[in-house]
Swiss-Prot record:
Residues involved in Zn(2+) binding: 109, 114, 138, 141
Signal sequence, renumbered to the chain: none
Protein source organism: Vibrio cholerae serotype O1 (strain ATCC 39541 / Classical Ogawa 395 / O395)
A Gene Ontology cellular-component term: aspartate carbamoyltransferase complex
Domain of life: Bacteria
Protein name (record): Aspartate carbamoyltransferase regulatory chain
Gene responsible for this protein: pyrI
NCBIfam families, alphabetized: ATCase_reg (TIGR00240)
Cofactor: Zn(2+)
Amino acid sequence: MSKETKLQVEAIKNGTVIDHIPAKVGIKVLKLFDMHNSTQRVTIGLNLPSSALGSKDLLKIENVFISEAQASKLALYAPHATVNQIENYEVVKKLALQLPERINNVFACPNSNCISHNEPVESSFKLSEKNNDIRLKCKYCEKVFARDVVTEIEA
């Protein structure tokens, strides 16, 4: 007996679809863009089956279009995610995610002795990637941290 089943998430008319987010990262992305406080409808798929990733997260945000700058921040969490802008149920633009060279005023430095904690300065990290391993170097204390160490502080 062969029974075909297909999981579906409702299509959105206008907005942004972020697909291929690594599993367990979708909630962090929601918080990064403050979407958990949005008045717009947000559809969240967590731990969905994925042939490429094994499992993945998916976000659909109605009537919200993320910018190229926001897409760069997203690349820090999900460098291989796809971001589609939807208008009238059609994909009108695909944003290519590119890891930014530097990220400012998003995360605090994990080094408690860093001057960025006691001085009125914006946090600033230089980003680098090698073999899918993302590292952040603090502009002030010059310590290098794994992505997970820096991003877990705010999440």
